[in-house]
A protein has these predicted regions:
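Short loop segments at secondary-structure junctions
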Residues: 31-32, 102, 168-170, 193-196
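Catalytic-core segments of class I nucleotidyltransferases/pyrophosphorylases
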Residues: 121-124, 131-144, 156-159, 171-264
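A structural signal for short hydrophobic beta-strand segments in well-ordered beta-sheet cores
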Residues: 26, 163-166, 222
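Well-ordered alpha-helical segments embedded in enzymatic catalytic cores
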Residues: 34-37, 109-112, 210
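Structural beta-sheet core signal
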Residues: 3-5, 52, 125, 150-153, ...
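Conserved beta-loop-beta/alpha segment of the NTase-like Rossmann-fold superfamily
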Residues: 61-167
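N-terminal glycine-rich phosphate-binding loop and ensuing alpha1 helix
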Residues: 1-68, 97
Length: 264
């Protein structure tokens, strides 16, 4: 199944300076950028056809893959000056690099790569900046068995804030942590059918337009995930993931638990 990755946004909260043009999916976690970790997750489950929706800082993403160094995350033997890899990461990946505009909303980026999805009843999509250990095969199978146009992974609210219940007299009736409320957030992992394109207007958004319309029609399903899920919307969040990687605490690296692929 093909995987569409949205990796053309500015990622302003991740920028370290006025001249920093590195897109958020290229922020490093360990020796590899975020986008690599997301792609390696999908590849672990057999999904190795990727469509990258490029925009801001596209050359960074192109350069990374055009000059990809397998020895960074794989064991190898140096024999007579020649490198013999004992395993590889991306040798079986097919990657389409598609320029989808600098200012384009997510929905418009998806519209602009639709021709790369011709003939695919279902496909996967992702923001390319969120890591998880969610069971992807289960997510796909549950969606395939449903008569729906889209599925989104949802997670409990990540905020550490508390909600305060007020009475008319100004007295506090209760305090509840946001994470304990019966609310769910968009987790950024999607399984989609071609039907979704019928609900995304020009310059529209995947969630606010496409998913919202499907929800009104009862054709949007959710996959609830309470396991590991971490965004990288800020420098602090990215740094926390990088530190966890260095300590060997990387639950999103499902390929490592299987004993194959990238190593520390």
């Amino acid at each position: 199944m093909k995987v569409v990755l949205f990796c053309g946004g500015y990622g302003m909260r991740m920028r370290s300076g006025a001249c920093d043009d590195v897109p958020k999916p290229m922020a490093m976690v360990g020796p590899r950028p975020l986008i690599w970790h997301v792609m390696r997750y999908y590849a672990h489950f057999g999904h190795t056809e990727f469509i990258l929706c490029l925009g801001y800082g596209a050359h960074h993403i192109k350069d990374f893959f055009l000059n990809y160094e397998e020895t960074t995350s794989n064991d190898f033997v140096l024999r007579g000056g020649r490198t013999e890899l004992l395993s590889t990461d991306i040798s079986d990946w097919t990657i389409t690099f598609a320029q989808t505009g600098i200012e384009s909303p997510i929905g418009e980026r998806l519209r602009r790569v639709r021709h790369h999805l011709d003939g695919d009843e279902m496909f996967l999509a992702n923001y390319a900046d969120v890591l998880t250990d969610a069971p992807l095969p289960e997510m796909i199978d549950r969606f395939a068995a449903r008569d729906a146009g889209a599925s989104m992974m949802v997670v409990p609210p990540q905020s550490s804030f508390h909600c305060v219940e007020l009475g008319e007299d100004g007295l506090v009736g209760g305090i509840t942590a946001v994470g304990e409320l019966p609310l769910w957030e968009n987790g950024g992992y999607f399984v989609l059918r071609q039907e979704v394109f019928d609900h995304i207007p020009e310059n529209g958004d995947l969630v606010a337009d496409g998913c919202a319309q499907l929800a009104k029609q009862g054709r949007l399903v959710a996959h609830q995930h309470r396991g590991f899920w971490k965004p990288t919307d800020t420098v602090k969040e990215r740094a926390a993931l990088d530190a966890a990687y260095a300590q060997g605490d990387r639950p999103w690296a499902v390929w490592e638990r299987a004993g194959v692929g990238a190593r520390a």
